[in-house]
Amino acid sequence: MSITVAIDCMGGDHGPHVTVPSAVEYLRHDRDTNIILVGRPEILTKELNALNISPDSRLRLYPASEIVGMDEHPAIALRNKKDSSMRVALNLVKNGEAQACISAGNTGALLATSRFVLKTIPGIDRPALAVVLPTISGHTYVLDLGANVNCTAEHLFQFGVMGATLVSSVENKPNPSIGLLNIGEEDIKGNDVVKQAAGLFRSSGLNFYGNIEGDDIYRGTTNVVVCDGFVGNVALKTSEGLAQMLASYLREEFRRSLFSKLAGLVALPVINAFRRRVDHRQYNGASLLGLRGTVIKSHGSADSFAFRCAIKRAVDEIRGGTLRRIVEHIETLRYNIEQNITQPASVE
């Protein structure tokens, strides 16, 4: 199955210096994928020349004259920059020339422009950002990570459906478990929105584990963790800060004395193995679910390895039929609700 993805090459902290080499390297390992590099041709050509690479049938350039700044207001970018590399890449998906768009650019602008250009799937009110986080038992998918600060119970339910479908399609895991992030496991805990969302999950036939707490995320208690964008973003940023603090503490302790430096040398293989397990770069690429097209948001500061992981995430979603399966599952759930059918609606 041949796949074509469009890359917003001008977005992110490093722009073409990372996106272009990442695309070239990715194509060396995936012969069934084609990439469209979107941006200013003269800049993209310069990057390709530095790599001794010329555009061909698998790697082609598509011109876009404007760039969305990382601190630019989403509404201004949407209204005034119709030829930005971000918007042109999304238009390629809309027009069927590409099956996915990948951008490391301004998150707010990407959310607004994606929703405007691609529109949402019927039955989905709002798109949600889903990210993979490492756990004791492997990894889990968390959504929403910031696309929606204020959510209704129905929104949270839709996030759960999309997250479960993502897991089942990308990882071939039938009927993945769903947990609702709360301040306690008991049914009486949480605000009205969370309580109502729990009721929707219980009556849906989905594999709903129940309420989970923050520490359950990294225990891997469930395959999918559902929360609103405010809670999800705070949880993610808190985790990133904790990881940085622990890394700083370790560096300080191993440099404290000659003995600790020697201990650090002895422990180096273990430390390197630990780093590989928790390396956030391998999880780069947040999926913007709920749109009529595949959109992946890379971290703005991603290096080449991390950006290649974002490309792979897009390709995996396309190969797994994630978008098609979300549409089908939402339609099934809507039909069951309309017909008052109560049999299980498991995600396959």
Swiss-Prot record:
Pfam families: FA_synthesis
Location in the cell: Cytoplasm
Predominant subcellular localization, coarse grouping: cytoplasm
EC number: 2.3.1.274
Key words, A-Z: Cytoplasm, Lipid biosynthesis, Lipid metabolism, Phospholipid biosynthesis, Phospholipid metabolism, Transferase
GO biological process: fatty acid biosynthetic process; phospholipid biosynthetic process
PANTHER family with a match to the protein in the record: FATTY ACID/PHOSPHOLIPID SYNTHESIS PROTEIN PLSX (PTHR30100), PHOSPHATE ACYLTRANSFERASE (PTHR30100:SF1)
Entry's family note: Belongs to the PlsX family.
Subunit structure: Homodimer. Probably interacts with PlsY.
Name by which UniProt lists this protein: Phosphate acyltransferase
Native species: Nitrosomonas eutropha (strain DSM 101675 / C91 / Nm57)
Gene that this sequence comes from: plsX
